[in-house]
Amino acid sequence: DALRIDIGDAEAAYALACAIPEFERGDDALDLREFRQRLSGRSGLVLLALAGDRAVGFKAGYDRYGDGSWYSWMGGVLPEARGHGVAVALLHAQEQWAMAAGFERIYVKTRNRHRAMLRLLVKFGYDILQVQARDDGAENRLLLCKRLRGDG
């Protein structure tokens, strides 16, 4: 089936996140209330990647900082749907949406152990701005940014 990107909601993003093995359980357990809090209201956006009628990936973000930047909070692709351009399609769709909405940059945080995500972000022009070191280097948090418009 052809892939298409559509608008979703916090509940759809949460359901997909729960099916993606890389997301933390335990201390950082996924919480539907947190999804609703971060993604509800006019500043939240959930994009769903659909193969036919089945959601196979998502990208969710919101206006976290109120400074003209967009915060890409969470996203992922189901393991069986990887390797087919789903993450790239979601990344581009979110960038296009953010530009059309007037945002100047996109921030995203990831962890060192999420190598595929890091490669994708760097490949498509995201710069590493900051590293929060952890005892286990694989758990280092990385803040990346991509400028969508302008020189500043």
Regions found by a protein language model. Name each.
Residues 74-83, 110-112:
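A short, internal acetyl-CoA/4′-phosphopantetheine-binding micro-motif in the GNAT/acyltransferase core
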Residues 107-110, 122-143:
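Conserved catalytic-core motifs of GNAT/GCN5-like acyltransferases
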